[in-house]
Regions:
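Feature recognizes metal-dependent phosphohydrolase scaffolds
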Residues: 1-625
Length: 625
């Protein structure tokens, strides 16, 4: 009670009079009765910057819907498309329209008024104060005046607003004002953005995506396995470093390492060419880093018998005379028997050259200022899971056993499973940032283990790299990666409800929102599962998955009316979007409709505001006593 009295005393400093308390209570109660803001969910971006940038700009079709709502009967389809493109890419589209001699004062008047009406529509669910804060500073006063215009008896306001517009045009400031309006529209269209992991992977520009996310007004991230891999590399895990380098070599995205983060591949290239006989330099480099990786993995596995990953120790199972490797109780043909740096008497020991290479990589990773900025952002905005407005968000899984019971690990004689296990994993990720050696090693466990909540499968990198696909009859079975039973059990509504209860979510509209596993739409898979309790939104942004999924990604929109999922078709290019007004074609499917519209008072933010109201009411009692 004494602590609360101290709190009220501090609160009194902020609200020194009864009238100031009344004013804030009126304001907070008004906010509680506004519609909840729109939430936008995206997952598995995989470094695909262009498609991500476009979907961020079009807000998964929200802006196109608002344009159609306002101007469906007034503008042609082409004119609506052009207006949308102008909102998505204002400077680029303006330049093209100017080259086509379409831009004049009359054009500015029409378009600016259209943009003002769109901004007015989108701002209607927010307080005027919040809208004002969202406005570009240079035009905040002017935009505030124009979008809150009200007709008066003598039409004085209309004359006033027309004069504002004419002054903007006479000063040749129309371009900047237009850009400011489009920025506001995009900001108001989505109140909060959720990224369900895997910003990184095979795409070339995860760094540009992170730069864009760092500019976003309201975002959270649920870490994916690829995010954890990069975080582990920056924290000093050599296995994670080798994996990051290997992945970027495999997908030919080395520019993100060298140009994005200043991580040099020059010494690896020299070493590979001098050590391996492959005629193709890329093959030699890939083999060199792969061998280093498996040596480092072996060292880590031996340091941590509690991981129970001895089955991944395969270098010592090779018979180079026969060109085979024993996995389990079977011998498989290797696609090469050239392992000049592997001493079969001590196969997991790095050579001096390999140690030198890893020393260089370590220095580059931990000293990269650009990477540090991005990793700090991932730590600041990220978590293993998030509970938000009655939904449970995570990238991978909540590990289960075959019977659908929560599974996990034992650490220091203590068993962790369910929510407690996910909390433990997050604490280890955060400890890794401090340099704790066990926590740093644990980052690789999270990348590779079937019990990892961000991965949930047994990663078979060695098999996919060194088994001969032509000479091994059961090659496909050998490289098949076992998945955590979660990925079968999550089709069951009872299991999903059990998971939701584990996180204290009992509402009938509570959902698990999940990424990580591409939804194979062309095979009949559906993103909404388990009686509507589970929504999987990894539809494959990455072009490499399009053939398997049949689409180009899913996103999810949750507004005050309910939830709808967006199924996206492949995106051509930003240039085509700008030049030909080609938006991403998307189909919408309603997940559910709220029985009653959701207001701020029904959200997590509403609960916080309710506590503030309660505190202010108690402060009022102090003033009245």
């Amino acid at each position: 009670m004494k602590e609360y009295d101290k709190y009220l005393k501090l609160l009194k400093e902020k609200y020194p009079t009864k009238q100031s308390v009344y004013r804030e209570l009126i304001n907070l109660n008004a906010i509680m009765n506004l519609p909840k803001g729109t939430e936008h969910f995206m997952s598995d971006l995989h470094g695909e910057y262009d498609v991500f940038y476009h979907i961020i700009n079009n807000c998964s079709g929200v802006i196109r819907e608002k344009v159609a709502m306002l101007y469906g009967d007034e503008l042609t389809v082409y004119e609506q498309q052009e207006l949308c493109t102008l909102i998505y890419y204002p400077r680029e589209k303006l330049s093209i329209l100017m080259d086509e001699n379409k831009v004049n004062d009359e054009w500015y008047r029409n378009v600016l008024n259209q943009l003002i009406q769109i901004a007015k529509l989108l701002s209607s669910k927010y307080t005027r104060s919040k809208v004002r804060k969202a406005m570009p500073v240079d035009f905040a006063y002017i935009i505030d005046e124009l979008i809150h215009a009200q007709k008066d008896e003598d039409d004085n306001r209309s004359v006033y607003h027309r004069q504002i517009m004419e002054t903007i045009l006479s000063l040749h400031n129309g371009d900047e004002f237009l850009v400011a309006l489009t920025d506001l529209i995009k900001r108001l269209a989505v109140d909060h953005l959720h990224i369900l992991g895997d910003i990184n992977d095979r795409g070339a520009h995860a760094d540009k995506i992170l730069d864009l996310l760092m500019e976003h007004h309201s975002v959270d991230i649920q870490w994916g396995n690829h995010d954890i891999l990069w975080m582990g590399a920056f924290c000093g895990n050599p296995v994670c470093m080798a994996l990051v380098v290997r992945n970027n070599i495999k997908y030919k995205t080395m520019s993100i390492l060298e140009n994005g983060y200043g991580i040099s591949l020059r010494f690896l290239l020299q070493f590979a060419v001098n050590t391996y006989s492959d005629k193709n330099v890329d093959d030699a480099v890939y083999k060199a880093i792969s061998v280093i990786l498996f040596k480092l993995e072996g060292q880590l596995i031996k340091r941590h018998p509690e991981y129970r990953m001895e089955g991944r120790l395969l270098l010592d199972k090779m018979n180079l005379d026969k060109g085979t490797v024993r996995i389990g109780d079977k011998d498989y043909f290797l696609n090469t028997n050239e392992f000049p740096t592997v001493d079969m008497n001590n196969p997991y020991e790095l050579t001096m050259e390999e140690m030198f290479l890893m020393g260089r990589f370590r220095a580059d990773f931990i000293n990269s200022m650009a990477l540090e900025r991005h990793i700090n952002f991932l730590y600041d905005k990220g978590s293993i899971y998030k509970i938000h407005n009655g939904n449970l968000l995570f990238h991978g899984c909540v590990p289960l056993d075959e019977q659908g019971v929560f599974d996990g690990i034992v650490v220091d004689c203590k068993s962790y499973s369910g929510r407690e296990y996910l909390d433990y994993c997050e604490s280890m990720v955060r400890q890794a940032r401090t340099g704790d050696s066990d926590a740093v090693d644990f980052m690789w466990f999270l990348w590779s283990n079937i019990l990892s909540p961000v991965t949930g499968r047994c990663i078979k990198t060695f098999e996919r790299t060194f088994l001969d696909k032509d000479r091994n009859a059961d090659y496909k079975k050998a490289i098949e990666e076992d998945k955590n039973p979660y990925y079968v059990q999550y089709e069951n509504e009872r299991i999903c409800k059990m998971i939701l209860r584990e996180f204290n979510l009992y509402n009938e509209n509570a959902h698990i929102i999940n990424g990580h596993t591409p939804v194979r739409t062309k095979e009949g898979q559906h993103p909404v599962r388990a009686g509507g309790k589970l929504i999987v939104i990894d539809g494959g942004f990455c072009e490499g998955y399009h053939a398997a999924t049949g689409i180009a990604g899913y996103t999810l929109i949750y507004n005050s009316h309910g939830m709808k999922i967006k199924e996206h078709h492949p995106f051509m290019s930003i240039n085509m979007a700008i030049n030909s007004n080609r938006d991403i074609e998307s189909e919408s499917q309603v997940v559910y409709v709220e029985k009653q519209r959701v207001f701020v008072k029904d959200t997590d933010n509403g609960k916080q505001i309710a506590e503030e109201i309660n505190d202010l009411m108690n402060l009022l009692k102090v003033y009245n006593s």
